[in-house]
Amino acid sequence: MLFDVKVPILGFETIHKMRLQKIDEIFLRLSSAEENSVVSFTLVNPFALRKYEFEVPTPLKILLELEEAKSVLVANIMVVQTPIELSTVNYLAPLIFNFDKQLMGQVVLDSNKYPHYHLRENILSHTHE
């Protein structure tokens, strides 16, 4: 599914259209849908790995039209390593997808408000919660 990027991914501010593909119940692939761009990310469903909750800032709710949305997805960027147990997840900057309006954006959480989330956490660090 194609999404309009309303709040860009940090470091990729020039990308305005992205394609999301489901791999399985836990993993997804996000790639640029623009010509001459080969940007691609592996995403993970954070709720499959740990307890995960945060407040979406009001400006982001407005930009992504979340108030009326019925189908919303939260996913996190994952850096895949070999073996998979060495992979890391960015819990401090989740991506939010509004499937109803095909809008997406990245929210950067305040590390003071969410000290238990980090930019690079081992994928297995919360498997026993």
From Swiss-Prot:
UniProt keyword annotation of Cytoplasm present: yes
Assigned GO CC terms: cytoplasm
Subunit structure: Interacts with translational regulator CsrA and flagellin(s).
Cytoplasm keyword on record: yes
NCBIfam families reported for this sequence: PRK13282.1
Protein name: Flagellar assembly factor FliW 1
Membrane-spanning segments: none
Function text: Acts as an anti-CsrA protein, binds CsrA and prevents it from repressing translation of its target genes, one of which is flagellin. Binds to flagellin and participates in the assembly of the flagellum.
